[in-house]
Amino acid sequence: MAKKVQAYVKLQVAAGMANPSPPVGPALGQQGVNIMEFCKAFNAKTDSIEKGLPIPVVITVYADRSFTFVTKTPPAAVLLKKAAGIKSGSGKPNKDKVGKISRAQLQQIAQTKAADMTGADIEAMTRSIEGTARSMGLVVED
């Protein structure tokens, strides 16, 4: 028989840097989950990813206080900022441009995000990432 699901907890945790401090501790503590067990498992799973990159994670908490979790790919905005070498996007994206990004970089980001995106093909996903880049104040170059 399947376990009864108690809650789903969605967080963004830095890769390889999960610890019991906020936001992880309070979110999991409310559900009665062993926080250190999650931190160790998450850090082990995100070993191969660049440290400090925010990783969205969905934690399924069961009635017996056990848990499973699924990691996603980093947010597109974070990958775009890293590729363009900027700290933050533009406050006025249509007026102030903060950086440039090539179409090849957009395709590479779309490939990275492909597992989590619901696009028809890689071209559609690239266009979606391109829209995110433009709304951040990045200029897309061919």
Curated annotation (Swiss-Prot):
N,N,N-trimethylalanine found at: A2
The UniProt entry, under PROSITE patterns, shows:
RIBOSOMAL_L11
**Membrane-spanning residues where?**
none
Write out the PTM section of this UniProt entry. Answer: One or more lysine residues are methylated.
Q: Which GO terms describe its molecular function?
A: large ribosomal subunit rRNA binding; structural constituent of ribosome
Report the SMART domains cross-referenced here. Answer: RL11 (SM00649)
Post-translational modification N6,N6,N6-trimethyllysine, affected residues? K4, K40
UniProt keywords (A-Z) are:
Methylation, Ribonucleoprotein, Ribosomal protein, RNA-binding, rRNA-binding
Oligomeric state and interaction partners are given as: Part of the ribosomal stalk of the 50S ribosomal subunit. Interacts with L10 and the large rRNA to form the base of the stalk. L10 forms an elongated spine to which L12 dimers bind in a sequential fashion forming a multimeric L10(L12)X complex.
Q: What is this protein called?
A: Large ribosomal subunit protein uL11
Organism of this sequence:
Shigella flexneri
